[in-house]
Amino acid sequence: MTDSFYGYDVIVIGAGHAGSEAALAAARTGAHTLLLTHNIETIGAMSCNPAIGGIGKGHLVKEIDALGGAMAHAADAAGIQWRTLNASKGPAVRATRCQADRALYRAAIRQMIEGQARLNIFQAEVDDLLFEGDTVCGAITHTGLHFKAPAVVLTAGTFLAGKIHIGPTQYAAGRMGDPPATMLAARLRERLFTVARLKTGTPPRIDGRTLNYTAMQEQPGDAPRPTMSFIGNSASHPPQVSCWITQTTERTHEIIRAALHRSPLYSGQIEGAGPRYCPSIEDKVVRFAEKNSHQIFVEPEGLNVIDIYPNGISTSLPFDVQLELVRSIRGFEQAHITRPGYAIEYDFFDPRGLKASLETKAIAGLFFAGQINGTTGYEEAAAQGLLAGLNAARHVRGLSSWTPRRDQAYLGVLVDDLITHGTNEPYRMFTSRAEYRLQLREDNADARLTAIGRDLGLIDDARWAHFNAKQEAVARECERLSAFWATPGNALGREVKETLGVTLSRETNIIDLMKRPELDYAALMRVPSLGPGVDDAQVAEQVEISVKYAGYLNRQSEEITRQQRHEATAIPLEFDYAAVRGLSTEVLQKLQHIQPQTVGQAQRIPGMTPAAISLLLVHLERMRRNRVA
């Protein structure tokens, strides 16, 4: 029998954003969990930009929170500047973003991990995994310790065969100051995984005391400040500070162009593809040669540190070039660099080798989450981590896995995109990736997912009570307003005209007035007989959106129902696609390569035809009838 110190239900390797959420989710649902990290002090570290949220990403954070995750709580504890992006646009694309104090964020994540029942931490580098045939059964540390578990979640970030590049200089590292997981990467390459390389980068850090802020544009945060968590309180946020905006200059671009031959990106030194939507400054100068300047967001890394993160000048140019280009930027003429920028290359595995649960198809019980699957970003990693940790715990207990559908969550879009299409560049989330984004808003992530999370064991009693109280308050307010009818001649109709300047031509239910573009909930509450309304801004927002967008939401729900007809029809793991008569060679090869788990996933494979899906459905139905017979 394995000593209890070495035996667990779930082992999570790596304690970044994916690993932290994976370990917490597994333990929260009852699994005895071990979190292995090479350094306990870097649990929850923000390796690159000190920010959480943004377009698409903020939606993921809200979904993580709706499922009981940690990221939103940590952001609320660490956010030092808050903004609602796209505030003037529709609710589907509004997104919350906060600048975060690195130390406060890391401390908040560590506190939650250390306070979680059934979750142990151990500091050790992992060199290999333990296997019994094609099933994982544990992990081996650098010092030879064997930890056993029937499920392992690997969240290695940029550490698998990581290599840092600064000009012609290159060396092995997981990130600056941390060793790479070289041995583990080599062992995984021996397995039946499709391995490739990706690249990401980070800008030089600047001593904020050496900057001239009068040459920049101040960017204050929003007031009132939003929160990330549905149960958060802006009163608990740290003090809010400003960010600043500046630009590169023509001189900056001249310096970069003159040094391109020394850039690892252009010398052939770097093999991996970089993130399309977060290019290096040298990439921007080359790709957008017609632009005279590029915007830089000057972001503080914390309340009690001097470091500034110049968002927009990620680079792997030699240090002497970095210093020259930094000092050519407006307001940076006397800048002192505290840490150089660099690029890092690392191994990732083709996510088409994953099930929707994030369990690998090749190795039973082994789950991947985060950058190992080809994604970029803290939020994408954390969302995958939560899902992988949940499903690892369910795997151990013999329960079916759970993954949200594309119409249920951005997490569902993320996973489906990865396992169906794969990626050859770092994948990041945007609202444009979702077909049903009016359904997948930040504001209703709890309504979409919290009840499911409760059934899965992810939601504690306090959050469940808070969620139910909110839903009941929304229903009560909708019911209250629906009871009011105004006519051109009654007292309420006259109040509406006097207060809002709206003349009614017929009897109207008050709640229908919110469907008018010029009226909202706050306006209606100015009508004496209707106000003052509810105090909770979240409740008021849900009342307004449910009314104002009812027609659009109903039409989208009908479309989802039509699309769901065959979405969940399962395809057996060992299904013989060659036995389906009439499939083209192209379609057959794609099906055999991707091995979709459901007909819905098969429909989304590029090049798949309606005729091929019909043939597949006929064959599956024939198989079902044969089994019954």
From Swiss-Prot:
Which domain of life does the protein's organism represent? Bacteria
Pfam families reported in the protein's UniProt record? GIDA, GIDA_C_1st, SAM_GIDA_C
Q: Which GO terms describe its biological process?
A: tRNA methylation; tRNA wobble uridine modification
Q: Where in the cell is it found?
A: Cytoplasm
Task: Provide the alphabetized UniProt keywords.
Answer: Cytoplasm, FAD, Flavoprotein, NAD, tRNA processing
Which SMART domains does the entry mention? GIDA_assoc_3
Give the SUPFAM superfamilies listed for this entry: FAD/NAD(P)-binding domain
Positions of FAD binding? G14, A15, G16, H17, A18, G19
What's the main place this protein lives?
A: cytoplasm
Look up keyword Metal-binding and say if it applies.
no
Cofactor(s) required, per the database record: FAD
Q: Name one GO molecular function term.
A: flavin adenine dinucleotide binding
- List, alphabetically, the InterPro entries matched: FAD/NAD-bd_sf (IPR036188), GIDA_C_N (IPR049312), MnmG (IPR004416), MnmG-rel (IPR002218), MnmG-rel_CS (IPR020595), MnmG_C (IPR026904), MnmG_C_subdom (IPR047001), MnmG_C_subdom_sf (IPR044920)
A cellular component term, taken from the record's GO annotations:
cytosol
Functional description taken from the UniProt entry? NAD-binding protein involved in the addition of a carboxymethylaminomethyl (cmnm) group at the wobble position (U34) of certain tRNAs, forming tRNA-cmnm(5)s(2)U34.
Family from the record: Belongs to the MnmG family.
- Subunit structure as annotated in this protein's UniProt entry: Homodimer. Heterotetramer of two MnmE and two MnmG subunits.
From the Swiss-Prot or TrEMBL record, give the protein name: tRNA uridine 5-carboxymethylaminomethyl modification enzyme MnmG
Query: What organism is this sequence from?
Result: Xylella fastidiosa (strain 9a5c)
Name the gene: mnmG
